[in-house]
């Protein structure tokens, strides 16, 4: 189901509630094959979790290490190993989610975008070792770097100040998405180097 933010500390003026929100609509539905529930609001039968061997501990948060994907990895295994099971979104199961102060810092947001791209590549896509895929990934990374630099420059000089009243909004919503591409490419290249 959905989750909505709450705060124990003063949030920065630029930080919008929607940055800490997940909502897939007001109608209950079975998720499409390429959609996944967020781990922030995920329920699973214990017996099914045990049958699948639990969560993949190679991905996700570990101690102080930032990571994502353990819930996505689990949902992918449910679909592969138990195809008759349904993954269901129920909007009435709402969670209030504490947004910790560090998650409202711009540097943390940048790192989170990179890591989410890296881990999405790790969990959802086959991290291929074929040379052509590595080359294409590197080309996407170069483009993402150029977009990142362009976004920083344009953000300061020419951003839509109505839509992005603070430079942080522009960076978070427009520029930092390119960090996901860089994270994905990083995972592909490092995976290739290891194999």
Segments (PLM) and residue ranges:
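Short, flexible, basic/aromatic active-site loop/helix in glycosyltransferases
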Residues: 1-2, 16-35
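Conserved donor NDP-sugar-binding/catalytic core segment of glycosyltransferases
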Residues: 1-13
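Active-site micro-motifs of SAM-dependent methyltransferase domains
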Residues: 5-6, 50-51, 97
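Short, hinge-like loop/turn segments at secondary-structure boundaries
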Residues: 14-19, 105-107
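An anion-binding catalytic pocket shared by soluble metabolic enzymes
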Residues: 37-38, 113
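A short, conserved alpha-helix in the catalytic core of glycosyltransferases
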Residues: 41-52, 59-93
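Nucleotide-sugar-dependent glycosyltransferase catalytic core
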Residues: 59-67, 96-118, 122
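Non-catalytic, C-terminal membrane-associated alpha-helical segments of glycosyltransferases
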Residues: 108-118, 127-195
């Amino acid at each position: 189901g959905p989750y909505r933010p709450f705060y124990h500390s003063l949030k920065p003026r630029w930080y919008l509630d929607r940055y800490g929100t997940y909502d897939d609509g007001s109608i209950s539905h079975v998720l499409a094959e390429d959609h996944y529930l967020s781990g922030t609001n995920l329920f699973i039968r214990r017996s099914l979790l045990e049958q699948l061997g639990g969560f993949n501990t190679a991905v996700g948060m570990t101690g102080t290490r930032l990571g994502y994907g353990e819930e996505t990895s689990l949902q992918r295994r449910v679909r592969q190993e138990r195809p008759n099971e349904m993954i269901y979104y129920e909007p009435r199961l709402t969670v209030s989610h504490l947004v910790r102060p560090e998650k409202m810092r711009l540097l943390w947001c940048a790192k989170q975008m990179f890591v989410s791209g890296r881990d999405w590549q790790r969990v959802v896509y086959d991290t291929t070792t074929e040379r052509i895929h590595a080359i294409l990934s590197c080309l996407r990374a170069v483009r993402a770097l150029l977009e990142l630099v362009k976004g920083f420059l344009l953000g300061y000089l020419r951003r839509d100040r109505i839509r992005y009243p603070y430079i942080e909004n522009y960076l978070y919503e427009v520029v930092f998405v390119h960090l996901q591409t860089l994270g994905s490419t990083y995972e592909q290249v490092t995976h290739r180097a290891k194999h």
